[in-house]
Amino acid sequence: RDNYKAISDNTRKILQSFGPLDVNIIISSGSGGSGSVIAPSLATELLDNDQNVIVIVIGSSDSRIDIDNTLKTLKSYDAISQKRERPVVAAYFQNSAETSRSKVDESVVSVLFSLTTLFSRENRELDTRDLYNFLNYHRVTSFKPKLVGLTVHIGDVPADATEDVITVASVVKDEVSLSFIPEYRCVGYIS
């Protein structure tokens, strides 16, 4: 966090070098180091420019400092959401004694694959506006913007995973019924 000013001053230059896309996925550690400062700065700049952003945060419970830094990073994303009145959509993974780094890496790759499929522009009846509304749910639902969790399910969604659902974006071969009714849903069909 010591280098916040330098990072903040250069965030726009970083984004100009790479340019925003239909979806901008930011992957970083949440447990300290430059990633826990750079990632929120990038997310802030992208949200300020009305871009689609998904953050993937990898936390750690290896030490008290890691836990504290992870919580601070998540609080930073929540503050960004509150200040900008825009959702911050985050997939969270945690390195721990129970979940090895290699297992977390596999999970992150699986989520990335699912997101690239979802945002590929290759799915019938699913356009960029549908996906914009999926991420910016506050524009099409009664929910207020906040830091929200992104969960990816391949196959059926377990009943215990539907309690706090705000929006659903699906890519399917054929019409699929959900066992619950979200406020907003968009569906793409594999071409």
Model-assigned labels for residue ranges:
Residues 1-191:
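Tubulin/FtsZ superfamily GTPase core signature
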